[in-house]
Amino acid sequence: MENPQVCECYHGDVEEEKKKKQNNTTSPVHVVLKIDFHCDGCIARIVRLSRRLEGVETVRADPDSNKLTLIGFIMDPVKIAEKLQKKSKKKVELISPKPKKDTKENNEKKANDKTQTVVAVTTVVLKVNCSCDGCIKRIQKAVSTTKGVYQVKMDKEKETVTVMGTMDIKSVTDNLKRKLKKTVQVVPEKKKKKKDKDNAEVNTKVGSPCQPGNGCTHGIGPYRFMEGPMTGFFSEEDQSYCSVM
């Protein structure tokens, strides 16, 4: 824009309720916002939206610096900026007065809480008599309309309905009973079988399989002692002759 223009508009008639709120503050507040102005129509639209905000009496738009000044008995400048951003669908930045650190920390905590909130998805199996296609359609419609239901699976042979989502199980069963006028049972989950430790055999013997109980010999047999008279080692004819030799 070649010729910067300053648009100043005054809010005329003020309702009595707004006057009572204005009396709570001693002096008007100057709120400076940064917003992108594209054309004259954009300026007029933003000024018109700003005049409708609570507590705003005077609006000054400076297209050259992309600043919008709101003057009035404004209780919360942060909320004013948020409302204007929501209505104008443009990015609005609060320049002054600067928000307190406490409000910034609270907003950051709220944002973190929203991102960290994880909803647990549960799966429940219901036993319902569904003998015909009409019953199946009615069951699917009744379950799918329940709040928090993500997925519905039907098993006609087993007559079971598997429901997945963040719903309340009691609300699902009550809804089915009321709409179908049939008995609805919750199928309990199967518990995993524990291993029988008593039947497990524990080998406590030490030694090789061929020689149990003799200990580890590392391939060398145990030492043996030859019993008997020493004369057995010698010849009967010549006792000085050694049979070992």
Curated annotation (Swiss-Prot):
HMA domain: residues covered? 28-92, 121-188
The highest taxon in the source lineage is: Eukaryota
Question: Which residues get modified to Cysteine methyl ester?
Answer: C242
Annotated propeptide span(s): 243-245
> Binding positions for a metal cation 1?
C39, C42
Q: Where is the composition biased (Basic and acidic residues)?
A: 99-113
Record region (Disordered): 91-113
One GO term in the molecular function aspect is: metal ion binding
Residue numbers with lipid attached (S-farnesyl cysteine): C242
- SUPFAM superfamilies documented for this protein: HMA, heavy metal-associated domain
The UniProt annotation places a metal cation 2 binding at: C132, C135
Pfam families annotated for this entry? HMA
Write down the PROSITE patterns for this protein, in alphabetical order: HMA_2
The alphabetized UniProt keywords are: Lipoprotein, Metal-binding, Methylation, Prenylation, Repeat
Keyword Mitochondrion attached = no
Function per UniProt: Heavy-metal-binding protein.
Q: Which PANTHER family match?
A: HEAVY METAL-ASSOCIATED ISOPRENYLATED PLANT PROTEIN 1 (PTHR46413:SF13), HEAVY METAL-ASSOCIATED ISOPRENYLATED PLANT PROTEIN 6 (PTHR46413)
Q: Which family does it belong to?
A: Belongs to the HIPP family.
UniProt protein name: Heavy metal-associated isoprenylated plant protein 1
* Organism of provenance: Arabidopsis thaliana
